Amino acid sequence: MAKMQLSIFIAVVALIVCSASAKTASPPAPVLPPTPAPAPAPENVNLTELLSVAGPFHTFLDYLLSTGVIETFQNQANNTEEGITIFVPKDDAFKAQKNPPLSNLTKDQLKQLVLFHALPHYYSLSEFKNLSQSGPVSTFAGGQYSLKFTDVSGTVRIDSLWTRTKVSSSVFSTDPVAVYQVNRVLLPEAIFGTDVPPMPAPAPAPIVSAPSDSPSVADSEGASSPKSSHKNSGQKLLLAPISMVISGLVALFL
């Protein structure tokens, strides 16, 4: 009995020793670094607020709101995959738009006109140089509503057949939203047709006559008059003796 208890005691001690040695031999578990927090999503640009405070764009903003196009543009602005590029005419551009008048447009035509002022992609100013080589670019209004772009020494020009203007300033340009100011309302051929009235010829430059160094006629006459008077006096003195001689000869024959 005592031998059996001793054997059990020895076995228990052996198990304890083996377990302790196993724990000592095993390496400590690695400590993992904390997972970094995800970067905050970029804040979306509120187009209504931007156009309200960025410049004199109240007329264009009113058209955006009345036609509901602002929702289309805002949804596209929130799409960071493509983004949006908007060309915004100043209030003065709408005041100057007399022919053709915008007041005759139907509600659908007015909506298409507003959609015509945006591209369904973000373009920085530097990207218009390559864009000008790709031909007409479709706008939000659809395939028939396209714009042509040319880049001349960094100046972006826009052509819609009815309208030729340029980007006068960058209002906002941070991917995915670009807003550029233009000085004229973009008129699409799909609404107004191809019968474009001739553009008024530029006013001729005023003719400025160069100052002449030669004296005027009056000055010439005034300058030559003393010489003429001296010449006439000399002629009179020369003719006086001749007249006297002739008079004497006539008297002898009489």
From Swiss-Prot:
Lipid linkage positions (GPI-anchor amidated asparagine): N232
Keyword Transport in record: no
Entry membrane topology: Lipid-anchor; GPI-anchor
Compartment(s) where it occurs, according to its Swiss-Prot or TrEMBL record: Cell membrane
Main location: membrane
Bias-annotated ranges (Low complexity): 206-220
Comp. bias (Polar residues): 222-233
Record family assignment: Belongs to the fasciclin-like AGP family.
Purpose of the protein: May be a cell surface adhesion protein.
Protein known as: Fasciclin-like arabinogalactan protein 7
Organism per entry: Arabidopsis thaliana
Taxonomic lineage from the root: Eukaryota, Viridiplantae, Streptophyta, Embryophyta, Tracheophyta
